[in-house]
């Protein structure tokens, strides 16, 4: 194997990993060749398909290129086009039996690694590809194409404008081309920069342009839309499948003499690398980097935005020639890059050019992207390797769209928001250069003349060493990437260059050399300090001198600001390993043309990613550049002036730094000579001094001494660079874990002494005299927003947030702000554990420490509120609003923000690790995924001793040695070892490692349960936060978690005597007990104190109940007052203690022990202490007032209105009823039950009056009033008695009230205010109240008043409650407080009842019913609610859940905070199978069978679910008996209950005559007109009872087969399997259900179901009945239509052609008109069910008035037949 190693190769040891398979080189080459062959075949097919399109594009582009080439050829050195790149070689990578990786730096003796890989050198274009990257097919006309690549890559207005200043004649043509052919230019640029977009993996396409500059694009196989052909290069880029690499590295090398580089590995992704080279540099020595560390770490830690140090590469210093063509080095994983220079010109070398959004978004792993254009200026360094690249890709595309509109550039380089260096020119008229610059952390503002000495920009002078850091930037903020689901698409290993100045710096405390013989050859004899300083001043100190910027060309600066705002999202390298970022200092050796020069002061990057962070820094402005003096020498380390300036500068990053800090060299600030900027914009002139640094995140560290900076270099080049301190010092101040070298988090520098905005940066910041009159910095300066400090921070931090004033791009700014929050998720200490909200259902963070309101974060994003550390404690003592929190608590720079409650963490403030990444908290809110910084360098060991005998080589060898030992654990986010921190932090860190425990939590009375993953640190608050939805921020949760032993129901049947003396039980303690027969939760009921006794006939029981009501009212008043004092929890507990009593007569497990858990209790800890079985039950907290009252009512108001509140509360409770009838199981069939229910309500009413008058002791009056109203209600409710339903001994997991069937007694009901439906076919006004009959004078059609005839409606006592609840719902709507809760809980209101009286026609949609004297009470409650400013509603919330022992319970509606998806199931009456006796089978359906049976002596029908039923059918079956348990109407099928034993069975009313379809099909059956009108009315009335529920219930399957006829020939609506509430109707619910002939035509168009769809179906049913009675035979709909052969044609033809069933000839005109109105094509033109009922009543009146006319129609028809 050694014989095959070419000379000059670098052998890198590669440790074998047990989980990684080592593939020999030959085998791998064979596999690659096979893949390449397949890919070549695919290429050929793709080429044939693309040839025609490519030819057309090539022709057009070549013409443009020829024109552009003439201009470029004249500009670039006159005759540089003939230069060729030599010594182009493919790096030969071999895997020596899994032991080492060999990188061949010299031409290999054999062909390239991949047979299809080739290096085609044609003139100036060199394409180097490896694997299947075959872009070299058609490299013709390379000279011209390369020049045009450079031209077209920056063929934007900016570069062309800059060329206008230099080359007037040529640039005019270029401008024309740019303006007229932007799309073409953009396509050209896309083609130039197009990478072979891979379906799988990475490919690198190196297109050298303009002699020796190179354009390297790397796609990670993400974007499949970037398959643009390199038409300019005549390269037909094919989408190929890349070779599969295991442990070996895919290295692409193009040296010119010798080169050096670094490598990294990945087990998921082939790591590609170009080794940089210079003409005069020697081969670099790569220290032994343990690739196994990479693999192991990638496997374990690269799961989120994590990073770790891979190793160190030592650069070999060399002398620099005057014209050295240093190529740029770009890798997917490892980079050490510099710029490419050519004499007199700065060449665009690398990257995704301006006009390829997709490529730019995907090329986030490029270290440098330099885009050069005609103007010989560096337009863009687009560097990535940053963690949150994907987070902002979409928004960046939007930003580019804004640029497209204003700058005529379809695609700008703004996509690479995570770019590391941004070199740009400010010469564009449309400020495109600023757009490009604002994308990047630092820009090299190059001269328009572009003259840059190669010695100033040489890769070898970058530094002595480079730290390679691995990071994963492919975790999208909107994605749900879990801890075990890493995405390696953007896995990068970035290079951080280290610089050293003298040997003393090598004697740092944290390292000692144990291997002095390592790297002996790496002496620094060739280090050229003078040349390094030239490079330092030019490359590191970002200074732009643009002499050609035109003032009039900044018209779009405000739009650019928006772009800048958007682009600054990822400028922090949030989620990236910090590559080399340098300070804006030093004077570049560029030609300085002082013509309106704009000094783009790219200051330290903004870690918190404020929208305008780089607006303030890199825009065209009159900034005085902070540069260092030209006479800086390598030996001098002056400390003068800079300390004072730092101290006085409010922008400095060292507010609290000591004066005499030795850790950094500070040179005096000098203003740039080119500060004159005549370019102003009136939109931005108001942006003053603070703009440059407003958005910079400042970390104010205190108590920092010289020891805290032991981990930093001090260099005469004034570039302070973090040392890779792998061993943490005890104070943890300067360890590498706080450096973004290994920490991806944007706030990872929180413990760093250096500015957070520049992780590897000298601490000098902008000059205090910086003024930004920049026309591109359209920003407003906001106050510094406090960050809720991690407890590890000893001093305050505040970041300045500048909001964007640009109104044109608000949406983009909002999106970017969201991305800012995403980026700020990483603003954590390096020791923060990763918390995945999506993955872990139980987060370990207390809810009080988390702002769980997503909407708040989104709103704050509009204001650029990236203060992710703001908390809203759910504790009432910390109930400040989020926005108020940000605006009110604005501490001074040295004043810490408001203290966080101590329960956040037990870690003291002095601890260096935080309990939680506050940015992770916010990311939970905003994006449902958390990306936290990697916990790094929390080492247990102390720093090694200082050794004075070691040289620089020892530093790097020690780093590698220490890295091998510690990287696998130190930089794994799941393993944190920090002995210096408190144990609480270590516990938090170890929570991810502990085995999760799963518990079951039951809701209420056990109706539902869910499995929850908890850990030892999971608190009750965490569980509540997962199951609650709070409408008001900071609202205390209204649920309590109880620990109990059993969910069994009470089996005691207490007698009335027992009940009479039983005290009332507070709902707060027993409202959620699992009592099916005694405690019934009706969560929709807003009634507060309405409780029903079984037989409250004695005075004692009444007095007891009254006293209970008084106590509750008093408590409510206290709660109302205490809401403003934020003491709800205490008062609620008091109420619970006062009323929490159980019936002593009950001997069952109702008295089982239970414990209410506090929010701070640890779930598992409490469970361990519990004796016996432990069951967690969530119960509603009855006494908590509405959350909205806290913010809307004042304590004085509450105090003044207490009495009125008491009165109003009970009025409301009296008038509001439950969703369904509530009665004791022992009195289901008793007449006394409903009377008792109503009497108690009235008794409460009188009691409230007594409370209002303060006559609490007048029990006799109470009794008197009670009996009075008792008898009064008996009279009104005589027809409302409930038929008995026998008891079931089986307990139900779903508690339900006893459901009653309607009685046979009827009462009158009037529809006085419903608009009448004009049945005259000549009258088009449906709502004409002056309707008259113009068809026949003999008919004597009654007028509107006469049509208000009686409609038989069966009455139920439960309907009285329903109406009252609707009234109360209206009250809440007026008060704007509890609308959501009431509406949610009123979903299943029963609509109609007796004696409906409506106040206005607006009540057509639903009919509220009131019962007798209860109606005025409802009106009183309305007025009281309005007058008391929402206090009544709040008190109602407290009183909603009073219970009586062993009777029924009504749950608070407004206090219920369940999520909609987790609402408790409705009541279902469970029947024991032993009570059912099957008789015979009477029918069968698709998934059920119907039997005739006997239940409790009554004939019933049992619907049995078939065994082969699918899960969907089972759900429909369950839904049907759910709905049947909700509704109760005389025209709906009566529901007795369900049986769940063995098979699911429903017990319903037995209908002897079968369905309407069946009875109409009998030809011998005589159907008369009275029976027709009866069936019509009953069918419509049954559907109307569904539609008038709240929310309305849509049947969705109305047809004659689902309308049943009982023995009395009454019609019953049945089959509710497809019924669904209208509020749950979505686009997916618009799927056509039911029989096609009955489906409304709008359903075919995808419109959701509504009540009008049921009306259409009713119209078809009315037609069927009418046709049957007139013709005497049944006819199916569309039976006579010969064009219809299939059912699905009916829906299509009815929707598209408007066909309808044929109307019989003898149909009465009014009836015909009614039917046609029901099936109208327009749903809005169809009448409501109430209108149809009135119309049918009118028709029946017509029949009664002249029956012979209707009968003659039948007789005439019989004669005709």
From Swiss-Prot:
SMART domains tied to this protein: S_TKc (SM00220)
The catalytic activity, as recorded, is: L-seryl-[protein] + ATP = O-phospho-L-seryl-[protein] + ADP + H(+); L-threonyl-[protein] + ATP = O-phospho-L-threonyl-[protein] + ADP + H(+)
Q: Which residues bind ATP?
A: 1482-1490, 1503
Task: Please report the stretch or stretches of sequence annotated as the Protein kinase domain.
Answer: 1476-1744
Q: Which UniProt keywords apply?
A: ATP-binding, Kinase, Nucleotide-binding, Serine/threonine-protein kinase, Transferase
EC assignment: 2.7.11.1
List GO BP terms, alphabetically.
positive regulation of signal transduction; signal transduction
Q: Which organism is it from?
A: Dictyostelium discoideum
Task: List, as start-end ranges, the regions of compositional bias called Basic residues.
Answer: 1263-1273
Protein name as catalogued:
Probable serine/threonine-protein kinase DDB_G0282963
Q: Name one GO cellular component term.
A: cytoplasm
Cross-referenced InterPro entries: Kinase-like_dom_sf, Prot_kinase_dom, Protein_kinase_ATP_BS, Ser-Thr/Tyr_kinase_cat_dom, Ser/Thr_kinase_AS
Is the Membrane keyword given for this protein?
no
Family per record: Belongs to the protein kinase superfamily. TKL Ser/Thr protein kinase family.
Q: Where is this region: Disordered?
A: 18-47, 60-269, 322-458, 545-717, 749-783, 798-830, 842-956, 972-997, 1081-1151, 1179-1305, 1318-1343, 1355-1459
């Amino acid at each position: 194997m050694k014989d095959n190693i070419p000379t000059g190769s670098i052998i890198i040891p590669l440790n074998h990993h047990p989980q990684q398979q080592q593939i020999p080189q030959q085998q791998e080459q064979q596999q690659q060749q096979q893949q390449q062959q397949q890919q070549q075949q695919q290429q050929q097919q793709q080429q044939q398909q693309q040839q025609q399109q490519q030819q057309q594009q090539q022709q057009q582009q070549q013409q443009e290129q020829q024109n552009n080439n003439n201009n470029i050829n004249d500009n670039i050195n006159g005759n540089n086009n003939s230069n060729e790149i030599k010594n182009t070689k493919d790096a030969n990578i071999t895997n020596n039996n899994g032991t080492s990786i060999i990188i061949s730096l010299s031409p290999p003796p054999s062909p390239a690694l991949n047979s299809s890989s080739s290096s085609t050198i044609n003139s100036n274009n060199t394409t180097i590809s490896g694997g299947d990257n075959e872009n070299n097919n058609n490299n013709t006309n390379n000279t011209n194409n390369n020049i045009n690549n450079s031209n077209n890559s920056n063929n934007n207005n900016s570069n062309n404008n800059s060329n206008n200043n230099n080359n007037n004649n040529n640039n005019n043509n270029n401008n024309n081309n740019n303006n007229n052919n932007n799309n073409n230019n953009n396509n050209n640029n896309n083609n130039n920069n197009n990478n072979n977009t891979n379906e799988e993996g990475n490919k690198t396409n190196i297109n050298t342009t303009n002699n020796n500059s190179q354009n390297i694009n790397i796609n990670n196989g993400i974007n499949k839309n970037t398959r643009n052909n390199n038409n300019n290069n005549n390269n037909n880029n094919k989408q190929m499948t890349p070779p599969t690499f295991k442990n070996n590295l895919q290295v692409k090398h193009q040296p010119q003499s010798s080169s050096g580089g670094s490598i990294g590995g990945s087990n998921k992704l082939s790591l590609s690398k170009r080794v940089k080279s210079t003409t005069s540099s020697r081969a670099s020595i790569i220290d032994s980097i343990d690739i196994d560390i990479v693999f192991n770490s990638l496997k374990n830690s690269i799961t989120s935005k994590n990073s770790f140090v891979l190793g160190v590469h030592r650069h070999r210093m060399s002398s620099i020639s005057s014209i050295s063509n240093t190529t740029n080095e770009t890798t997917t994983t490892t980079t050490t890059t510099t710029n490419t220079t050519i004499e007199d010109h700065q060449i665009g070398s690398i990257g995704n050019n301006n006009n390829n959004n997709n490529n730019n978004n995907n090329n986030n792993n490029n270290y440098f992207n330099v885009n050069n254009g005609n103007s010989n200026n560096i337009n863009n360094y687009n560097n990535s390797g940053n963690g949150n690249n994907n987070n902002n890709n979409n928004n960046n595309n939007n930003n580019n769209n804004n640029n497209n509109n204003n700058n005529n550039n379809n695609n700008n380089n703004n996509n690479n928001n995570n770019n590391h260096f941004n070199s740009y020119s400010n010469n564009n008229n449309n400020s495109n250069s600023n757009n490009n610059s604002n994308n990047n952390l630092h820009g090299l503002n190059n001269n328009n003349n572009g003259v840059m000495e190669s010695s100033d920009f040489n890769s070898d002078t970058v530094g002595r060493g480079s730290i390679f850091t691995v990071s994963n930037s492919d975790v999208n903020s909107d994605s749900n990437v879990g801890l075990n689901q890493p995405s390696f698409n953007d896995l990068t290993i970035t290079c951080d260059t280290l610089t050293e100045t003298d040997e003393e710096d090598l004697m740092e405390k944290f390292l000692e050399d144990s291997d002095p013989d390592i790297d002996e050859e790496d002496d620094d004899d060739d280090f050229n300090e003078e040349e390094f300083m030239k490079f330092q001043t030019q490359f590191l100190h970002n200074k732009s001198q643009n002499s050609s910027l035109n003032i009039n060309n900044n018209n779009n600066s405000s739009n650019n600001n928006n772009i800048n705002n958007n682009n600054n999202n990822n400028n922090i390298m949030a989620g990236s390993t910090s590559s080399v970022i340098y300070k804006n200092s030093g004077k570049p050796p560029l030609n300085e043309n002082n013509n309106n020069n704009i000094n783009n002061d790219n200051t330290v990057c903004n870690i918190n990613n404020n929208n305008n962070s780089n607006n303030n820094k890199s825009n065209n402005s009159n900034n005085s550049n902070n540069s260092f003096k030209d006479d800086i020498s390598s030996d001098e380390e002056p400390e003068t002036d800079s300390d004072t300036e730092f101290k006085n500068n409010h922008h400095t990053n060292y507010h609290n730094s000591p004066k005499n800090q030795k850790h950094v060299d500070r040179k005096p600030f000098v203003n740039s000579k080119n500060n004159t900027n005549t370019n102003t914009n009136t939109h931005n002139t108001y942006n003053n001094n603070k703009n440059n640094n407003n958005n910079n995140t400042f970390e104010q560290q205190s108590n920092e001494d010289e020891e805290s900076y032991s981990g930093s270099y001090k260099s005469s080049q004034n570039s302070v660079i973090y040392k890779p301190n792998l061993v943490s010092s005890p104070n943890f101040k300067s360890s590498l874990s706080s450096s973004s070298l290994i920490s991806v988090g944007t706030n990872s520098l929180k413990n760093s002494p250096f500015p957070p905005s520049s992780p590897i940066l000298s601490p000098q910041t902008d000059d205090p005299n910086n003024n930004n009159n920049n026309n591109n910095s359209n920003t407003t300066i906001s106050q510094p927003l406090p960050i809720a400090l991690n407890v590890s921070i000893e001093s305050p931090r505040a970041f300045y947030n500048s909001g964007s004033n640009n109104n044109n791009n608000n949406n983009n700014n909002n999106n970017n702000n969201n991305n800012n929050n995403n980026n700020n998720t990483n603003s954590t200490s390096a020791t923060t554990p990763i918390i995945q909200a999506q993955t872990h259902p139980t987060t370990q963070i207390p809810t009080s420490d988390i702002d769980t309101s997503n909407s708040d974060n989104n709103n704050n994003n509009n204001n650029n509120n990236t203060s992710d550390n703001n908390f809203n404690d759910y504790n009432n003592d910390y109930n400040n609003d989020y926005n108020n929190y940000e605006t009110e608590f604005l501490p001074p720079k040295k004043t810490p923000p408001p203290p966080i409650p101590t329960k956040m963490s037990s870690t003291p403030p002095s601890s260096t690790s935080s309990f939680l990444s506050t940015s992770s908290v916010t990311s939970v809110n905003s994006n449902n995924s958390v990306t936290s910084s990697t916990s790094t360098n929390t080492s247990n060991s102390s720093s090694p001793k200082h050794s004075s005998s070691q040289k620089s080589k020892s530093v790097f060898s020690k780093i590698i040695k220490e890295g091998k030992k510690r990287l696998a654990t130190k930089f794994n986010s799941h393993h944190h070892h920090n002995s210096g921190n408190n144990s609480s932090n270590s516990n938090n860190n170890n929570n991810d490692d502990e085995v999760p425990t799963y518990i079951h939590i039951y809701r209420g009375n056990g109706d539902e349960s869910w499995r929850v993953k908890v850990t030892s640190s999971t608190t009750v608050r965490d569980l509540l936060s997962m199951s609650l939805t709070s409408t008001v921020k900071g609202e205390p949760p209204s649920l309590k978690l109880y620990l109990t032993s059993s969910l069994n129901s009470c089996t005691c049947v207490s007698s009335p005597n027992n009940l009479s003396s039983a005290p009332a039980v507070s709902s707060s303690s027993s409202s959620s007990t699992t009592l099916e027969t005694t405690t019934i939760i009706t969560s929709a009921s807003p009634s507060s104190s309405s409780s029903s006794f079984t037989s409250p006939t004695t005075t004692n029981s009444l007095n007891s109940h009254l006293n209970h009501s008084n106590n509750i009212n008093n408590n409510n008043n206290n709660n109302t007052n205490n809401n403003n004092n934020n003491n709800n929890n205490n008062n609620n507990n008091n109420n619970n203690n006062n009323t929490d009593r159980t019936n002593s007569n009950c001997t069952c497990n109702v008295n089982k022990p239970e414990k209410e858990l506090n929010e701070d209790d640890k779930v598992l800890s409490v469970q361990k202490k519990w004796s016996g079985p432990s069951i967690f039950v969530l119960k509603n907290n009855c006494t908590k007032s509405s959350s909205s009252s806290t913010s809307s009512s004042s304590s004085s108001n509450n105090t003044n209105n207490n009495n009125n509140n008491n009165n109003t509360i009970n009025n409301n409770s009296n008038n509001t009823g439950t969703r369904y009838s509530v009665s004791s199981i022992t009195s289901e069939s008793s007449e006394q039950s409903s009377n008792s229910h109503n009497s108690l309500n009235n008794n409460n009413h009188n009691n409230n009056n007594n409370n209002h008058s303060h006559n609490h002791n007048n029990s006799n009056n109470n009794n008197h009033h009670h009996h009075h109203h008792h008898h009064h209600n008996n009279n009104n409710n005589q027809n409302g008695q409930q038929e008995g339903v026998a008891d079931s001994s089986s307990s139900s997991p779903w508690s339900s009230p006893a459901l009653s069937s309607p009685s046979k007694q009827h009462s009158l009901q009037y529809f006085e205010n419903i608009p009448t439906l004009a049945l005259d076919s000549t009258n088009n006004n449906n709502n004409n109240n002056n309707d008259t009959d113009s068809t026949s004078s003999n008919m004597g059609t009654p007028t509107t008043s006469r049509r208000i005839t009686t409609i038989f409606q069966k009455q139920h006592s439960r309907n009285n409650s329903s109406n009252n609840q609707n009234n109360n719902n209206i009250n809440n709507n007026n008060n704007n407080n509890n609308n959501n809760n009431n509406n949610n809980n009123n979903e299943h209101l029963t609509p109609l009842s007796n004696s409906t009286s409506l106040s206005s026609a607006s009540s057509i949609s639903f009919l509220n019913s009131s019962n007798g004297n209860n109606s005025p009470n409802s009106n009183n409650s309305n007025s009281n609610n309005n007058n008391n400013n929402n206090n009544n509603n709040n008190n109602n919330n407290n009183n909603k859940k009073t219970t009586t022992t062993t009777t029924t319970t009504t749950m608070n509606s407004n206090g219920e905070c369940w999520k909609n998806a987790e609402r408790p199931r409705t009541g279902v009456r469970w029947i024991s199978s032993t009570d059912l006796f099957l008789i015979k089978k009477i029918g069968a359906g698709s998934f059920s069978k119907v039997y005739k049976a006997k239940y409790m002596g009554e004939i019933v029908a049992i619907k049995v679910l078939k065994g082969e039923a699918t899960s969907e059918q089972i759900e429909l079956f369950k839904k049907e008996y759910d709905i049947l348990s909700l509704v109760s109407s005389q025209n709906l099928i009566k529901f007795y209950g369900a049986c769940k034993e063995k098979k699911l069975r429903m017990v319903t009313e037995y209908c002897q005559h079968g369905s309407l379809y069946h009875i109409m099909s009998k030809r011998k059956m005589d159907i008369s007109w009275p029976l027709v009108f009866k069936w019509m009315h009953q069918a419509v009335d049954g559907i109307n009872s569904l539609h008038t529920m709240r929310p309305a219930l849509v049947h969705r399957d109305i047809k004659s087969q689902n309308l049943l006829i009982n023995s009395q020939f009454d019609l019953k609506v049945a089959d509710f399997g497809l019924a669904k509430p209208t509020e749950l109707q979505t686009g997916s619910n618009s799927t056509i259900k039911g029989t096609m002939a009955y489906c409304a035509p709008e359903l075919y168009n995808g419109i959701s179901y509504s009540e009008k769809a049921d009306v259409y179906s009713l119209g078809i049913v009315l037609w069927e009945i009418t046709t049957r009675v007139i013709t005497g035979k049944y006819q199916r709909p569309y039976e006579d239509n010969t064009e219809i052969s299939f059912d699905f044609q009916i829906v299509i033809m009815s929707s598209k052609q408007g066909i309808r069933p044929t109307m019989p000839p003898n149909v009465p005109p009014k009836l015909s008109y009614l039917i046609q109105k029901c099936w109208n094509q327009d749903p809005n033109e169809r009448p409501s069910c109430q209108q149809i009922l009135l119309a049918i009543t009118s028709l029946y009146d017509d029949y009664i008035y002249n029956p012979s006319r209707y009968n003659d129609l039948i007789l005439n028809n019989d004669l005709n037949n």
